[in-house]
Every structure is written in structure tokens, then in C-alpha cells.
A protein has these predicted regions:
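Serine-dependent amide/ester hydrolase catalytic core
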Residues: 1-60, 110-113
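Structural helix-boundary/capping segments
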Residues: 4, 60-113
Length: 113
């Protein structure tokens, strides 16, 4: 595949993904596709795709996104959600993240290492 063809395919993918936001304000996904691993295991998760399955597509579309901790299961390790908005809607991300933190405060929590 020629480089220009790849660029055209990526641009078409981005346009399709962005059109989704014509009907919705926000997309909420897990930040990663698996529970947190042990310290030093990130490279294995990244190579397998589990570390970036939900975040990687946004590198193509260029949409604003943020990840915040939202759950703390019994293992004491935070689970994150990724908030994704349309172009130029960083304000929406910050407002929603602020409301979620107010409803379920987490800044005082620290995972055991």
C-alpha cells in the first residue's frame, strides 16, 4: 500500500468516527482492555494491544480525550474510564470529569505498590 493510500484510509476512518458525534456528545470507554497488571508489565500489555486498544484509535482521529479513575475494586487498583468528545469540546470533558470526581471522590486514594 502506498503511503498516500494509507493516509487516505486513515482520513476516511477519522471522518467516519467523527460523524458518530453528530448524534452523541460523549463516548465513555474503559481506558485499557484488561485490569491493571503488576509493576513493570506495561510493555507486555502494550505489545499485546491490551494497553492501547481503546486509546489508539484516537491517535488517528485526533479527538480530545481524558482518562480518570472511576472504580476501586477489592484489589485496591484503580480502574479508569476514558471520556472522548468531538473536536473542540475539551470543555465538556473537563465538566464531566469534574462531576464524576465530585460524585465519587478519588484524589485521596492511592494504590499499594
Amino acid at each position: 500500500v502506498a503511503l498516500y493510500e494509507l493516509i487516505e484510509r486513515l482520513q476516511a476512518h477519522a471522518a467516519s468516527a467523527l460523524a458518530w458525534f453528530d448524534n452523541f456528545d460523549l463516548l465513555v470507554t474503559p481506558t485499557v482492555a484488561a485490569p491493571p497488571g503488576v509493576l513493570g508489565d506495561y510493555l507486555n500489555r502494550y505489545v499485546s494491544g491490551l494497553g492501547s486498544a481503546f486509546t489508539r484509535p484516537l491517535n488517528v482521529t485526533g479527538q480530545p480525550a481524558m482518562s480518570i479513575p472511576l472504580g476501586w475494586p477489592d484489589d485496591g487498583l484503580p480502574r479508569g474510564v476514558q471520556l472522548v468528545a468531538a473536536y473542540g469540546r475539551e470543555d465538556l470533558l473537563v465538566r464531566v470529569a469534574s462531576a464524576l470526581e465530585e460524585a465519587a471522590p478519588w484524589s485521596h486514594r492511592k494504590p499499594a505498590l
